[in-house]
């Protein structure tokens, strides 16, 4: 983690002092930095949720045998818990627009399965809007076997979306989409940290 921070600082300083040539637009470099930052924050979000789950008595596992035989547990999407295996073992489709997109966590509470995507955002913008769209898309997904989807958004932008204030047309549109898809898919959830804690408490 510290190595990543140092590399990011070095990269920013390097490009700040150097005029890029026409073959390397500065926007591309910033996009790469933003993507790496988003991935880092996403992983922090995953770890935060796993920590909350563990406090409520859920166990984290790394293989299918333990996951399938335990009532309250969580796993992260990984090589063992890839899309193919998850679809086969849980009987789900996970039909996102982006083909073969994996989510972040699989939560099991007895016979209930919840598939979770976690993001951390503080501001809006091009890359951030794309991540919000991905979270909203998760709410549209449905499964015949009652599996639920969780869109978890942490950070200042989550508070803006969940508030009653205006904040402009874009925010209002995003709120309307969230409400619409939650109404269409009542088994799904859009939560911040407090909402996630409440949901997990109810599952126990």
Residues covered by each model-derived region:
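Short amphipathic alpha-helical segments and helix-helix/interface helices
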Residues: 50, 136-140, 178-179
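Domain-level recognition of nuclease-like catalytic cores that cleave nucleotide substrates
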Residues: 151-204
